[in-house]
Curated annotation (Swiss-Prot):
Residues 11-30, 64-73, 169-182, 721-739, 913-925 have a biased composition (Low complexity). Pfam families: NST1 (PF13945). Residues 76-90, 129-140, 312-321, 740-769 have a biased composition (Polar residues). PANTHER family: LD36051P (PTHR31780:SF10), STRESS RESPONSE PROTEIN NST1-RELATED (PTHR31780). This is Stress response protein nst1. Residues 332-363, 433-462 have a biased composition (Acidic residues). The gene is nst1. Keywords: Coiled coil, Cytoplasm, Stress response. May act as a negative regulator of salt tolerance. Its main location: cytoplasm. It is found in: Cytoplasm.
Amino acid sequence: MVPAPHTQHYSSSTMPNSSSTTAHSAPTTNGDVHAPKDHQLSSPSDTVPAPVNRKKQKRRQKQAARLAERQLANGHVSTDDATQNGSSHTNPERHHSDDGGADGPDHEQPANGDVYPKDGQDSTEAHIDSQNPQGPNGTESSQKSTGRKSKKKKGKKGRNGSHAQGDETSTPMSTPSVSMSHPLPPPLSSHLASHNILKPAKNRSIWNTSTQEERENIKTFWLELGEEERRQLVKVEKDAVLKKMKEQQRHSCSCTVCGRKRTAIEEELEVLYDAYYEELEQYANHNQGSFEKGSPMVPPPRLYQPPLRSPGQHTRTQGQFHPSRGRIHELTEDDDLEENYDEEEDDGDEPYSDEELDEEDEETRAARADFFAFGNSLTVKVADDLLKNDGKHFIDMMEQLAERRMQREEDTQYGIAAAHESLHSGHNHGPFDDEDYDDEEDEDYDSQEEEDYEEDEMDAMTEEQRMEEGRRMFQIFAARMFEQRVLTAYREKVAEQRQQKLIEELMEEETRNEQRNAKKAREAQKRKDKKRLQKQAKEEERARREAEKAAEEAAAKAEQEKKLEEQRKKREEQRKKKEAERKAQEEERARKEAEKLRRQREERERQAEAERKQREEKKRREEARRKEKEERELREKKAKEERDRKAQEQQAKKDTAKGGEEAKDQEKRDDQAKRSSQQVPVPIPTNLHHLQGLSPTVAHSPHVPSATPVLPKAPTPAKPRQPSQQDSHSSSPHSQAPSTDPSQASLSPRSMPVSQSSGVASGNSQQGQGLHAMLHQPQPSTPLSPLGRSIPPGFSSVNGIPPNPPGLSGMVARPPVGHDLPSYPSHSGPFISPFRGYPAPTGIPAPPGINGARPMPPGRGFPLEPAQGFAFHGQQIPGAFSTPQGGLPHRHSRQPSGSLERSPLENHAQPMPISRPSPIKRPSSTQQDQQKGDDRTTQRDVDDLSAHLGSSALLDDSDVSLSSNLSQSLPGATVPGTFSGPARASFGGPSLFPDPLSASGWSNNAFGSGGHHRAHTSRPVAIRLLVIQACKQLNTMSPSKGADGYHDVNLVLRHVEQLRPQNEPSISLKEMLDICDTEGNTQNGGGTFSIRKDETGEFVKFEPDNNSAASGHRGSIVPGEIGSPVPSSSLPAFGGIGTPSVLRQYSSPPMGF
């Protein structure tokens, strides 16, 4: 390993603190300052600071240094001199602490593993440390404090302790020799040597090596190099230095002085470099054997020889070149150097003032920044540091050597003590970089120059000392550069090893990663395989479950289908069973219908037989009546003759008794005859009952009755028949039984007596008798003639209501606005009703014939329209008091009424047995005899007319006399009801239209008035309407059986028969089917019939259309529905089938009066 001999020489010759340190300072070894013993004994003010003049203090130091040099020259070596000349202070404790505490608090291992010594290390450590000059970034590994003063004090305290310890333990190892024989460095301690050298290489790590290990490795590396390799390293350094110097000189001055400097520098450099290499060879050859044996390294003797001048000369020389070193310090531009060397300042500055301490610190930093940079960081190259700024550091050092050399020449020639001053004053070259200087350094330089001027007289440097000084400086620089190259080569080798090792480790790491990844991949594959197996097992399990589920579903489906099939079979059986039951029911129903039809046929046969017997009986009765009539005519003839005789007798008597009154009576009779001749002939009576007690003497004559001849009555056949305003049913005398009560008389006006000459007494008695008869008088059913009926004489008006206009005596005037209210009682008579429909206050109706009115039926609470069979009549107004009336004509004995309310013509009718009329009696002058005779005459006339006139004349002897025909639509009586149609033949209550024959234009109905309609309905239309109604009823009653709308024709026919009025002929199946084939229109109910034939029979279905009266029949009431009257033969005047309700909307156009 290359030794660092320059460390000792540099420490003793080039340290700036050798001339400017405190009293305690002495030559240093790698930063260790040792105070001489004599100075320590003579300086009791070590720790006591005292204000001392700075210049005086420096003189004392220089004087002490000169004394020490003299002692060295005389051969007396003190402890301090031995330390200065290379003797080492051995401190076992310190070696031990350095060895074992490489990583302790005083040592910080940098990135590359090198540890550098700090203050207090001995010369051996300094020697070893010189081979590892630089650390990373050129920084010291000690921790830095933040304050400048604290760093100084800390370093001074540490150095004081090390000085004391070194002084106590140091021993001089050898004496100096002028003949270049240098003392050897002290041997290393046994534990240090064994730890550093004999450590196995395999146990050493190339990554983390301690300072001692690295130093040993560097030594080993240098010793292993060959001659050529070593020369090549030196050659490279020499070429580099020369190249840099030449490049620098191109920019320098070209004057003679500068040229001499360049020449001197080149020559000096070549000589010194060659000499230094020779010394290195000598050292290497000398140290080869001892190194292998573990002996300590011995530096070359030449490098360790003491200086040839006194301490004073050394200090003076250093002071002369201090400004250049200051410039080098500025050019380093390394702030870490200042910080790292703050702690290595001398501790002798404490007794002095702060100004002196600052100046000395600046000097110390300047000196150490120049040549001690290699000891702080191994990564900063010394050559790069010195050659920075185009090698100004090295060039300045060479210039210093050249200046010294020139100074020596001038001193020998002129003997000038202050040669350096004249040199600088004569040659005024500025520095290479003026801005490198600062004010503080200028002050230091000025203070140094002043001190040097004061000491010029005392300092005298021999030429040999100056040569030695320059040689030593170059050796230090060359050694640094060389060591740096060796260190660089070593680092390259270590870097290569480390790179190789790193590659190997990376390969191993990669291999391990690959193995790890392969292992992970295998494990992942295993997990995947496991998951796949699990998934496969799950899939198999799911497939098995699905198969089981499918099998269960299939079984359940089969079971369900089986159940459905059973249910279907069961439903089919039930359907067949129901069908069989339905067929059985249909058969039973058909059987019942056939039985019913049979019974109906038998019933009709029985009825036909009974009618036949009745006709036979009728013929017998007619024959007997004819015979009786003949006999009666004979008796009447005889009686008439008798009456005529008696009348003539009475007349003769009257003529004699009353001569003057005969003309008046005759005139009255003529007026009465004239009035009777103006009336229409009396209609055929429908009831032969006569009113009891009524006689021509109802209106009593005020004259006394006398015997007057009776006028002959008009013959009965002369009475004309009503043309079309009376129904055959109401005009037939055979439907009513003749009355045998002698008290009942005809209402005909011809029954009125001609003579009215009864007395007052007899009038009073007859009045009471007539009143009794009126109380028991039945309502006559025979319609009275509308003409010829007027108020009798003396009854011009009733209650202020005017009489009828002339010629219309039968038309009773309507009441005024309050016509619906009963009139107030009239004072015209005790029993006379004020007018038609208004009963008297006593409840006794007026006699028939007066005003042409009919009394109000008892119990009626609302006014009724007049019977439709009467053309001229007045409105009926309910009375407050109604008295039951009896004796109304009875109805047909075979057909009872089915109406909602009895007709006013049939109220309180009592059936009476048919009997023969009373026998003909002789005419008498009494009322009863006259009445009886009139009854017989009227009966004969009616029977004769009944046999030859009306509908009876159209019938054959074998036919049954029916009440009406379907093709006829004759007006009939209005049945009390809720509604009334426009036609007088329709069924209902008060009409919306007034009576066109009435005297007033008012109607009982408040909705309006209008003309009348004449209903006209044919039998096919009526049958079709009944079939439509039957189909609708069947759809309503049995929607399930007739869901398709088809019904059995027999069933429909039965319903039609039920709806058919009883007075109409039966409808056959063929007739109904033929009528169903007709098209529907607005007259016959609309719609169409569909007939379907199959093996079970014929079925009919009604399909309505827009012409059909679907729901409401437009206000009409269909027979059989709620609110409709039950069809009956007692209402023959309604016009046949369907006239009361259905055909209201199909009535004929209105007819005028």
